[in-house]
Curated annotation (Swiss-Prot):
It comes from Chelativorans sp. (strain BNC1). InterPro entries: UPF0229. This is UPF0229 protein Meso_0256. It holds the Pfam family DUF444. Belongs to the UPF0229 family. Residues 94-106 have a biased composition (Gly residues). The lineage of its organism: Bacteria, Pseudomonadati, Pseudomonadota, Alphaproteobacteria, Hyphomicrobiales. Residues 53-110 are annotated as: Disordered. It comes from the Bacteria.
Amino acid sequence: MPIYIDRRLNPKDKSLGNRQRFLKRAREELKRTIKEQVRAGKITDVDAEHRVPMPARGTSEPTFRPDRSSGERGYILPGNKEFAPGDRLPKPGASGGEGGTGAGRGGSDDDFQFVLSREEVLDLFFEDLELPDMVKLNLKEAVAYRPRRAGFATSGSPTNINVGRTMRNSYGRRIALHRPKRQEVERLEAEIARLEVESDKLGGKQLEALRAELESLERKRRRIPYVDPIDIRFNRFEQQPLPNASAVMFCLMDVSSSMGEREKDLAKRFFVLLHLFLKRRYERIDIVFIRHTHEAREVDEETFFYSTQSGGTVVSTALEEMQRIIAERYPSREWNIYAAQASDGDNIAGDSERCASMLRDELMQLCQYYAYVEIIDERETEIFGATDNGTSLWRAYRTVGDQWPNFQMTRIARPADIYPVFRKLFARQSASPTRR
């Protein structure tokens, strides 16, 4: 086991160990404050700035200092009108408020407040969460790449020359250096030819001047080439790595008539938190939204959260739709498949056992992780205190959880339960569950 020895020198009057412990305490205080604010407000408040108070006494790093309540210290104080030589002065207290008068007596420090940005809030909120078992057994060892346009370069293969950009640079350079145009040379040549025909004495002097000017123009044209090597530009390409381990999250929500506005609101809050978590922690992940009543269909994000459709309840239709989408677009040998389902547990007679059978025999063999959240009434928390009690869907899903350790289920009764339940389902694990 490797042993690390920190030989960094401490700064003056500081201790790196103390500073690290201080930063850890401050970070924990920020996380605790944000979680309390979100728990007391709306789940969507996570995706916003937060004004976080922190006690002023906790904003300074620990240092060694003399104890004012004990020991002897020598003072040299300025003169005043209140004390005479020989008077005994009381020692000031630890807060610095003792011995004062008026408004200064008994004072305390105000809380220090600052604003955390949206990115900082999300980083703290989802710091220790992750998708479980984010590994495929048959990941490709060689990383695949694809070329992507990345501007221009001054060197490269002749086949990648960008003619348009090269000629643009050439034209700009010729204008800046005042390269003589071909029309100017042709005009002088025509004038010289005309004077050579006349060949009089006056025309001879003018002819010499024109020939000298023509030679100067030709010399300048040779010195300033039409296309210079510095003008040439090549198309530049970067090799963009293709992701080997791709992930997809299926969000299954019951929107049947048995789900009241309260139940739907709790389910939507849970999925909003899940959506923020996935988009913040993972750059490349597909999210499939499925709503179901007596029939299920894949919808977009807007419809998933804001549609008012309702109807009967057949939970197995959502599992069938999920199974169909996996077969068409997400082969399990290439994708990490996750699912989160929210329902009130109400289901048509006989369908709960069918749902459990589909999960046990088919879907759980494809999924890395499956989370089931049941929305119950606050009064039912005491009735269904034992995990064996509950709706027919809950009891059927219990058999799935007994067989598959990567199947988790829990209940939500009030908005304050959402965040603890979310952390329970997606807490970072030291070891991933093994499939049976």
